[in-house]
């Protein structure tokens, strides 16, 4: 076990010698203010979990001998029992350990529970989004934190080097004209619409800034790793089914959400209905797919199929040769509202209903209120290709400032 600890220290030293990004996401502050014994960080592959954990680790007031970083996807940890490793570390003075890619460890759920019950040590671990979603016991025992893809606001902060305030949805609705004016004025020599189009293509994943040219290939590699490593491992998916998962994503990417049906998908991907439903659930847990329920689905007597979107607009640029612009806009809107912890459902009049109260129609400059005029609920248009809106016609890009 001592050899494994020494190897872990060498790997950690190598990581620390690399320059960490100076940009710090809001989730880092949330984790830093937590007093929980064991904390978990979950999110899609590629959103910056490792970077955030290393930033947090450098802020802690422990000596090097009292801290340890391990990544469970590294070969030296593959056959190591996680509880035994942490127990040995505690017995030799360990106070804090950061565990990356914990879902790669054998029987990690039981190991974490045993560590929580029997060992005195502070832990921050990371893993696939599917960990938190598939194991409700985690959120009861541990402090769990979500790290979403970069918002449009965060993308601008990294690209331009200065900060923008995030805004509540109510402020966007009530003060949209003033907010959009203020943001446009701060851009100096930049224009908001070209920046927004950049974000839709590549702005959700921080590694874009490391090597913009190779971003499409790296995002495609990320998708393949989620399918081949995370989902196949967590849900025991047979290797011959992985290509069907990828095919399912491509079919969804190339289709308009309202034109998709379970029958069409079972035919196109050659899956039975029960298997298809399982695969859709796996893809959502891996943050590759977003299933949006109808607002009436909560009434069991009313059966409505979910609308299916890719999880983030960047995925369309890799999985579709040319995606539908309407789908791209709706994907962005749903991704920003959901990441800001709003309930997103679809409705017959309009595109989405948010928090069961507010209806939104998404579209281009020519979109009007004709589809919304008979609604009793408050209704707004989220419009692409405009820099500044009107009272109930809000620039689509402004919904990227919610988190």
Annotate each predicted stretch with a short phrase.
Residues 207-348, 356:
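Accessory nucleic acid-recognition modules appended to NTPase machines
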């Amino acid at each position: 076990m001592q050899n494994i600890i020494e190897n872990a220290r060498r790997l950690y030293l190598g990581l620390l010698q690399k320059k960490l990004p100076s940009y710090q996401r809001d989730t880092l502050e949330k984790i830093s203010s937590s007093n929980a014994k064991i904390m978990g960080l979950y999110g899609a592959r590629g959103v910056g979990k490792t970077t955030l954990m290393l930033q947090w680790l450098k802020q802690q007031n422990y000596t090097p001998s009292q801290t340890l970083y391990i990544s469970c996807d590294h070969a030296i940890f593959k056959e190591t029992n996680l509880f035994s490793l942490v127990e040995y570390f505690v017995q030799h003075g360990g106070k804090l350990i950061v565990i990356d890619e914990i879902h790669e460890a054998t029987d990690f759920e039981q190991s974490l529970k045993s560590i929580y019950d029997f060992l005195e040590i502070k832990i921050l671990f990371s893993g696939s989004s599917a960990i938190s979603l598939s194991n409700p016991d985690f959120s009861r025992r541990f402090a769990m934190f979500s790290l979403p893809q970069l918002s449009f606001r965060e993308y601008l902060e990294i690209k331009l080097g200065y900060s923008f305030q995030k805004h509540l949805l109510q402020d966007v609705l009530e003060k949209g004209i003033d907010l959009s004016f203020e943001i446009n004025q701060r851009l100096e020599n930049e224009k908001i619409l070209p920046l927004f189009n950049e974000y839709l293509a590549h702005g959700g994943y921080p590694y874009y800034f490391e090597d913009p040219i190779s971003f499409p290939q790296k995002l495609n590699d990320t998708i393949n790793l989620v399918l081949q490593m995370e989902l196949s491992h967590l849900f025991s998916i047979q290797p011959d089914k992985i290509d069907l998962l990828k095919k399912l994503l491509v079919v969804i990417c190339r289709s308009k959400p309202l034109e998709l049906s379970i029958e069409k998908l079972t035919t196109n991907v050659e899956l039975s209905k029960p298997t298809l439903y399982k695969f859709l659930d796996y893809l959502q847990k891996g943050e590759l797919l977003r299933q949006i329920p109808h607002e009436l689905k909560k009434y069991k007597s009313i059966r409505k199929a979910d609308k299916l979107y890719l999880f983030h607009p960047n995925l369309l640029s890799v999985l579709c040769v040319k995606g539908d612009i309407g789908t791209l806009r709706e994907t962005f809107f749903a991704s920003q509202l959901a990441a800001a912890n709003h309930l997103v459902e679809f409705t017959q009049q309009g595109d989405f209903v948010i928090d069961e109260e507010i209806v939104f129609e998404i579209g281009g400059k020519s979109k009007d209120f004709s589809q919304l005029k008979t609604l009793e609920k408050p209704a707004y248009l989220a419009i692409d290709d405009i820099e500044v809106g009107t009272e109930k016609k809000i620039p689509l890009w402004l919904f990227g400032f919610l988190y």
